[in-house]
A protein has these predicted regions:
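Cytoplasmic helix-loop-helix junction between adjacent transmembrane helices
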Residues: 108-144
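A membrane-interface helix-boundary motif in multi-pass transporters
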Residues: 47, 158-175, 359-382
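Extracytoplasmic gate region of multi-pass secondary transporters
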Residues: 34, 215-256
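Conserved MFS/SLC helix-loop-helix module at the cytosolic interface between two early adjacent transmembrane helices
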Residues: 64-99
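A late C-terminal transmembrane helix in Major Facilitator Superfamily
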Residues: 333-366
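C-terminal transmembrane helical hairpin of 12-TM major facilitator-type secondary transporters
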Residues: 277-323
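Helix-loop-helix hairpin linking two adjacent transmembrane segments in secondary transporters
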Residues: 100, 137-192
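Helix-to-loop junctions at the C-terminal end of transmembrane segments
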Residues: 65-77, 265-278, 361
Length: 400
């Protein structure tokens, strides 16, 4: 894909457009389900078991979309972004329909749309910002998912306080997606072609040698367990808080707090100076996220859930950011397939998390006990990732 057009806007407009595009596709299209889930449970339109499968349908869609983008790229990125945003609006509004059998299909398609918008927004915006001489500012767009989480989380909190129905919440979020898309639309302009017309292919720019298959496989496994590690918290946080902090007025603020952590983590990761071995940064991020996942269980208080939300959110973008750089380092001649492998295993972890939580809840003495077991397993998977990275660091030292 060649994301280079005439220069239609200044770099700040492009960064804001990218940020809002990701806020729409990720914060609303992918993650709006989390703050609305307690409302759906309260309305009696879904059970926790059904919610687990709805979440997995979305994550399966995201995996399918991400892999499709990796191996079957489209030639018109801005058109793909626009269509993905329109799809996000329609599919979000569709969740207000009182027809439960339709919902898994809507969430699956929303997952595909969010993946397309994420991949093509990233490619287009980063290229445009670089063409204008501000490449280092491009990573600012990755605050978008966190901004979307904060926006939907605060909105859902207000809806709960004022007695909204879940259907009303879906309609409101669809309208919010429409408003954000209207702001983004004029910036998404420019020429797009399938591939550069000349010069050295991008896969040949790197001159470093290929690393061993064992190293790549271990990196993929290490990244894959992170998908399972965070997803139970990212899917059920408001519900878990209601099980532990019964009657607290702050129950719906933990999710937007997690979004604040995502924003902070994206800003810090994008401004870091070059690190010789990024695997140490990944170890640190995994330990931080494992602590966040387990925090509410070992410190079941307002402070514990607040700290846990931040500790899960801060490494969220950073883990992906660092892992993708590692993929480029170990497979410089085959970057896309390597990223596809990492994405696939991470996606499988996400897909497995919610149904496993649903199974544990249905076979536990109480909902709280089921969630506790699921979160312990999630934290354990992140610690397993730390072990994988420790092996990588020891067996495959960075030499350049």
């Amino acid at each position: 894909m060649d994301f280079s057009p005439p220069l239609p806007a200044n770099h700040r407009r492009i960064i804001v457009a990218g940020l809002l595009s990701l806020a729409t596709a990720m914060g609303i299209g992918r993650f709006a389900f989390t703050p609305l889930l307690p409302m759906m449970l309260h309305d009696g339109v879904i059970t926790l078991g059904g919610a687990s499968w709805l979440a997995s349908a979305n994550y399966i869609g995201y995996l399918v979309g991400a892999l499709f983008c990796t191996f079957r790229p489209f030639s018109k990125p801005t058109l793909v972004i626009r269509m993905g945003l329109v799809s996000t609006i329609v599919l979000t509004l569709g969740m207000a329909a009182p027809y439960e059998p339709l919902w898994p299909y809507l969430r699956f398609l929303a997952g595909i749309s969010s993946a397309f918008v994420f991949v093509y927004t990233s490619g287009w915006c980063l290229t445009q910002v670089a063409l204008r001489g501000h490449a280092s500012m491009g990573a600012m767009i990755y605050t978008g998912p966190g901004a979307g989480i904060v926006l939907t989380g605060l909105a859902a909190s207000a809806m709960v306080a004022t007695g909204w129905s879940a259907a009303g919440g879906w309609l409101a979020f669809g309208a919010l997606a429409l408003g954000l898309t209207v702001l983004v639309w004029p910036v998404l302009t420019g020429r797009n072609t399938l591939a550069p017309t000349g010069g050295t292919p991008t896969t040949q720019v790197q001159t470093a040698g290929e690393h061993s298959t064992g190293e790549v496989a271990l990196l993929a496994l290490a990244y894959g367990v992170a998908g399972f590690g965070y997803i139970i918290t990212a899917t059920f946080l408001p519900v878990i808080a209601r099980q532990v902090l019964v009657g607290s007025p702050w129950l719906d603020l933990f999710w937007p707090l997690l979004g604040c952590g995502v924003i902070a983590g994206a800003l810090v990761a994008s401004r870091m100076k070059r690190v010789r071995d990024l695997r140490w940064m990944l170890v640190f991020c995994y330990l931080m996220q494992a602590a966040g996942v387990a925090m509410g269980q070992f410190l079941p208080s307002l402070l514990g859930f607040a700290l846990g939300s931040l500790l899960v959110g801060i490494p969220f973008t950073a883990i992906t950011y660092f892992a993708m750089q590692e993929a480029r380092r170990v497979r410089p001649q085959h970057v896309a397939p390597t990223i596809g492998l990492l994405t696939a295993l991470y996606g499988l972890g996400q897909i497995l998390g919610p149904p496993l939580a649903g199974y544990l809840i249905s076979h536990a003495a109480s909902t709280s006990e089921g969630f506790s077991t699921a979160l312990e397993m999630a934290a354990g998977s992140l610690l397993l990732g730390v072990v994988f990275f420790a092996i990588l660091i020891r067996r495959y030292p960075v030499t350049t």
